[in-house]
Amino acid sequence: RPCFTLPGCAAVNGIASFVSAPAVGVFMTEQLYRGRDYTDREGLTVLTCFSVCSLGFFGVLVSLGGIEHLYAQVVITSFVLTFVIAAICARIPPLSGKRDHYIDGTEQTAQDRVPRKIDHRFRAAVQAGIARSKELDFKVFMATLWSAITFTQKIVAYVVSVAIVALLLAEHTPLFTWLGMPIIPVLKLLQIPNAAEIAPATLVGIAEIALPVIMISGKGIAEESIFFITVLSSVQIIFFTESANAMLESIIPVTVLDL
């Protein structure tokens, strides 16, 4: 809570995307929001700051860029940057301006924000897990499965359509080249090689996370620049082929303008 203004359960929730997928992280956040574990502000903070691509997809990105030998460096750099950016974004608009109200409309109190003191944390975690497992029955399993299926169905159509349109715009129109022109001086100031060639790729990630790396792969781009674009793509978090659509389809109050 001191770093990210979030409750302790966000620690597990924040890692969910790293080990699975952004949409899974969003789904888990939505379930915690339904259970009054998060307020509007806390739920939106977790959605927009921690729904990072999975460790497996990091492998896809470095493979597309031809920098497989830098996989560990890409993951560690992205991991650190994600938490640094999250600590900043949680304290600035629009996240800082969201209400600290739960799903039922009740306002979070100062007592709610006080962390519980737990002795022997590992033992307590094991006992809580055992107790929780005893509550599981077939009806709960089917209800959760149905929620996951309907949630997936909502975003699949967007994933396919947005990815196709974004790829067509990136590969067959000069749109992103024009949009990337103001970025060239910034990249040159940072002394990043091939500034003009990679500038369009810095913006196209909002449509599809892998598209920036696809755009620059096989074009003789310096390894440093490929590393930069790969990390930038992963920490950008919000992309409309998956994470952004999952966020908009969740019950947590969020708008396109917020994203």
Language model region names:
Residues 14-24, 172-176, 200-211, 234-240:
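Short helix-coil transition sites and intra-membrane helix breaks within transmembrane domains
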Residues 25-26, 85, 162, 166, ...:
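Alpha-helical transmembrane segments of polytopic integral membrane proteins
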Residues 54, 77-91, 155-168:
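Hydrophobic core segments of alpha-helical transmembrane domains in multi-pass membrane transport
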Residues 95-149:
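Intrinsically disordered, low-complexity non-transmembrane regions of multi-pass membrane transporters
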